[in-house]
A protein has these predicted regions:
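General structural signal for secondary-structure boundaries
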Residues: 11-14, 43, 47, 86
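Charged/polar, solvent-exposed surface patches and flexible loops
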Residues: 30, 34-41, 92, 96
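Enriched for short, Lys/Arg-rich terminal
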Residues: 1-11, 57-100
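A generic structural signal for solvent-exposed, polar alpha-helical segments
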Residues: 19-20, 51-52, 74, 96
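A short, surface-exposed loop/turn module that caps and links secondary-structure elements
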Residues: 36-62
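Arg/Lys-rich, positively charged N-terminal/basic patches that mediate binding to nucleic acids
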Residues: 1-37
């Protein structure tokens, strides 16, 4: 499978789940997909090193390596991934700074 085909397949995976993406490297998309599959199979978010945000306890941040995060929301006891974003963008959002 070519890298462009792989990227297209991964993008489709996230689109089917209505997960917003920013421009992430291929290895990050692959790891994020594995983590999302584990969530969908019932793995508790804390076993994926996820933590609830202090500012909004319904939001869970799951690390995807050192520089990326999946933001998910607790909807009726189910953790639903909503966004994949860089750690820099994550920090800006939670510090209340405007995006570039």
């Amino acid at each position: 499978m070519t890298p462009s085909r792989t990227r297209a397949d991964l993008t489709a995976f996230f689109e089917r789940r209505n997960i917003q993406l920013c421009k992430a490297p291929l290895h990050v998309l692959l790891k994020a997909r594995r983590l999302i599959h584990r969530l969908e199979q019932g793995t508790p978010y804390w076993q994926l090193h996820g933590k609830r945000l202090a500012s909004d306890r319904s939001v869970v941040s799951i690390p995807v390596g050192r520089d990326w995060r999946i933001l998910a929301r607790d909807i009726s006891g189910r953790i639903v991934p909503q966004e994949l974003l860089s750690h820099e963008r994550y920090n800006r959002r939670h510090l209340g700074l405007k995006y570039r």
